[in-house]
Amino acid sequence: DRDEIPTFQSVILASVYDIRNIRRKLRPDEEHRENSPWNIAADFLVDMSFSASEIGGMLKEYENDYHTGMDISMIAHLLYDYTSGYPYLVSRLCYFMDERLSDTDAFSDRKSTWTKKGVLAAVKMLLDENNPLLDSLTHKLNQFPELEKVISKLLFQGQTIAYDPDDVAVRNARMFGFVKVENSTVQIANRIFETRLYNRFLLNDVEQNNIIYAEGARQKNQFVINGYLNVKLILEKFVETFDYLYGDRAETFIEDEGRRFFMLFLKPIINGVGNCYVEPQTRNRERMDLVIDYNAQQYICELKIWHGNAYNERGEEQLSSYLDYFHLKKGYMLSFNFNKKKKIGVKEIRLGDKTLVEAVV
């Protein structure tokens, strides 16, 4: 007698590739691209990302085994802030902390590793490595130059990208999880991807030959004291350099390029030790809050286009509340002011229990 063995009647493939893209790999000819018997797949409407609470649950299990004394809620939310719950990125950061950072000169044991400083060190390792996911992100930008252009405008100018489901480049970027759609606009999917993209744009050969990048590199040694960034001095030197190089340029040039030029000036100063990114909820044509991660410390600098004193005061209040989120007492502002009577320079003001360093160029 034959044994009866149950067999599957159907197979579900859950993947970042939809069935049409698998078919393109097998049959790339253009004339049959959309009319194909392969177009039979149903949407797999399952959110594969982790929530902060789900990350916390995994950390709790780890803590039960290793007793690190970590602040589970804080670490879980920090991991989520950088990854938006992208499973591979969450796993990779935790791997770095568990396997690569613990028992090193910087982190003597697991207790010292599972801290905010340890998470930021793991983020730095992830951004510096080559892995298939981040390599694929770069490949997609090379494959779709138009996508690269619109993402550059999003990152540096705060330009809104309306979601168009017929845009092949954006559609593919969304399918691979590199971008997401919120309120019918395209956003970078998470902070890790965004920081990697900033590094790509700021460290390419063209930008490294930019004169303001060269000025940042030439002056970099004076900006770090005992491992800490002197952001006030960075702003002072940037104001001097920018005014000298571009002070007579047209308003539209400064509005479009000013914030990118500050990041270009900053990048050689922090490169190798730190990174920077923009909080997406603050990004628009008028302002964006730049977060600088440097040597496990964080600095917040609002980059904005000047629109009068009342707008400036609201910006100060917004920055003050944002500092509360990061548990910081000092913040920085850089305003690109088109008023001919403006006073160029840097000053400090007190706002409640916080100090704001304001630079005007």
Where are the regions that the model predicts?
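Active-site metal-binding core of divalent-cation-utilizing nuclease and nuclease-like domains
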Residues: 268-296
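A short helix-turn-beta junction within AAA+ P-loop NTPase domains corresponding to the substrate/partner-engaging
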Residues: 26-48
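Sensor-1/coupling segment of RecA-like P-loop NTPase cores
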Residues: 1-34
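Conserved catalytic cores of phosphodiester-cleaving nucleases, focusing on short active-site segments
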Residues: 262, 290-292, 296-307, 322
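Nucleic-acid nuclease catalytic cores
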Residues: 312-316, 323-352
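Acidic-basic catalytic patches of nuclease active cores, encompassing PD-(D/E)XK
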Residues: 237-277
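Winged-helix-like regulatory helical subdomains adjacent to P-loop NTPase cores
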Residues: 44, 51-176, 182-183, 211-221
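Short, amphipathic alpha-helical interaction segments positioned at domain boundaries
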Residues: 131, 193-227
